[in-house]
Amino acid sequence: MTITLGQSTKNDKDLFDTMDDWLRRDRFLFVGWSGLLLFPCAYFALGGWFTGTTFVTSWYTHGLASSYLEGCNFLTAAVSTPANSLAHSLLLLWGPEAQGDFTRWCKLGGLWTFVALHGAFGLIGFMLRQFELARSVQLRPYNAIAFSAPIAVFVSVFFIYPLGQSGWFFAPSFGVAAIFRFILFFQGFHNWTLNPFHMMGVAGVLGAALLCAIHGATVENTLFEDGDGANTFRAFNPTQSEETYSMVTANRFWSQIFGVAFSNKRWLHFFMLFVPVTGLWMSALGVVGLALNLRAYDFVSQEIRASEDPEFETFYTKNILLNEGIRAWMAAQDQPHENLIFPEEVLPRGNAL
């Protein structure tokens, strides 16, 4: 009997193993299994947005011009939401609304649902990409966990809020000025700035910016491997590859400034992660509340007193009047399908009008 030693020539790999080898191969741009979701969805979302902002009008859904072809610029062009009459239809190209007609589909606002859905799955694919790469190189998954915060905000604003309202019409359109209009709408109809979840979101984002600036400045300040420059700014190279800053010096500095300071890098960086991520999560929860038409803080006693005493006014009562003005002006313009007509005497007029 002859026994052959050595590697078997038989290929025992199945299709899954072959795909896994190719997808996770070490290359310039990692693909991975998450890439099967990320790259097509990101391509279609961006492609749909560029197509819509270049060619597609919003005349049939909002009564607006919204494309470069109609004279808009980068700040005013948008892929706008479908009409309110279409409610929560997915507006599939082959669905009963468009019936396979691409031009009709664009006129109805089909590009908005196309961009929103592919954008959401693209963002989820990017988060899964971070999970997959972290597992491959044996890192913790905190990058992916942090990225869940902007995903939560996107999903709550573009999907959950309009699902709680009468249709996709009340979601933000994809454009700069369109997002600004949506913010004004949120303020006028929901008093969003006085919502505690919005306050937590603002504290998280601005607090994170402050922490980031302080952290970057402190690291630059405490580099101890210097050059031969004549002054502090020339002597330290901000692109120095080695980590040569002094945590002890930084701790002593901030202890003298504030009386307290971070004692180790882990707690410091966890705090820098915690502040913005928690703020964005809280904002997303607040938007879910708005989908259910939950109210912000109401100081009714001040409103009653202001209505009875013409000499009593607070910043709160002034803002409530401002919100009423936003509603009166926006409702007729923003919801033309309702045919709202307000008498001239109820519309707020400023000095410029």
UniProtKB/Swiss-Prot annotation:
Pheophytin a binds at Q130, N143. Keywords: Acetylation, Chlorophyll, Chromophore, Electron transport, Iron, Magnesium, Membrane, Metal-binding, Oxidoreductase, Phosphoprotein, Photosynthesis, Photosystem II, Plastid, Transmembrane, Transmembrane helix, Transport. The modification N-acetylthreonine is found at T2. PROSITE patterns: REACTION_CENTER. GO terms for cellular component: chloroplast thylakoid membrane; photosystem II. Its main location: plastid. It is a multi-pass membrane protein. Photosystem II (PSII) is a light-driven water:plastoquinone oxidoreductase that uses light energy to abstract electrons from H(2)O, generating O(2) and a proton gradient subsequently used for ATP formation. It consists of a core antenna complex that captures photons, and an electron transfer chain that converts photonic excitation into a charge separation. The D1/D2 (PsbA/PsbD) reaction center heterodimer binds P680, the primary electron donor of PSII as well as several subsequent electron acceptors. D2 is needed for assembly of a stable PSII complex. 2 of the reaction center chlorophylls (ChlD1 and ChlD2) are entirely coordinated by water. This is Photosystem II D2 protein. It comes from Cuscuta obtusiflora (Peruvian dodder). The lineage of its organism: Eukaryota, Viridiplantae, Streptophyta, Embryophyta, Tracheophyta. The gene is psbD.
